[in-house]
């Protein structure tokens, strides 16, 4: 079954962007390549029980088993050792990526308390969009009674676009709730 957001992109959004951005070919337009979700654990990464429960939570949120990231250096001030667990990360592509973005935009983000929108300043010079979420419990897949600690997520949406304006146009068409100019 084709995800709803993927179908919407190919049938409606891609032709609209071709017209508005002035592309000669439909496939020259911006496209979401992948979504990378990172959850840093810090010193909690050394605890196997916490690591396992957090890995399960991130797996439920993304629908894919996360990979463990490790510290690259030992830093005495942060009490970290080289090679110990630093966090978890998941890279989503294809159908799982579209399903995650659909759930993020339509279910998870509206559940954030006092949510006014995403900052449009999160674009880099290549057009990729990065933002953070302070509480992973906004996703309905996470059982609130079973979590030990509320953790944050870093989400990077990698987009193949010529510049950040084209990426912004794509994410707006995908219903990303950006803060409008003039709203504070």
From Swiss-Prot:
Top-level taxonomic group: Bacteria
GO cellular component, one term: ribosome
Alphabetically ordered keywords of this record: Ribonucleoprotein, Ribosomal protein, RNA-binding, rRNA-binding, tRNA-binding
Keyword tRNA-binding included in the entry's annotation: yes
GO annotation terms (biological process): translation
Keyword Ligase: no
GO MF annotations, alphabetized: rRNA binding; structural constituent of ribosome; tRNA binding
InterPro entries, A to Z: Ribosomal_uL5 (IPR002132), Ribosomal_uL5_bac-type (IPR020930), Ribosomal_uL5_C (IPR031309), Ribosomal_uL5_dom_sf (IPR022803), Ribosomal_uL5_N (IPR031310)
Assembly, per entry: Part of the 50S ribosomal subunit; part of the 5S rRNA/L5/L18/L25 subcomplex. Contacts the 5S rRNA and the P site tRNA. Forms a bridge to the 30S subunit in the 70S ribosome.
Function: This is one of the proteins that bind and probably mediate the attachment of the 5S RNA into the large ribosomal subunit, where it forms part of the central protuberance. In the 70S ribosome it contacts protein S13 of the 30S subunit (bridge B1b), connecting the 2 subunits; this bridge is implicated in subunit movement. Contacts the P site tRNA; the 5S rRNA and some of its associated proteins might help stabilize positioning of ribosome-bound tRNAs.
Similarity comment: family membership: Belongs to the universal ribosomal protein uL5 family.
NCBIfam families: PRK00010.1
Protein name: Large ribosomal subunit protein uL5
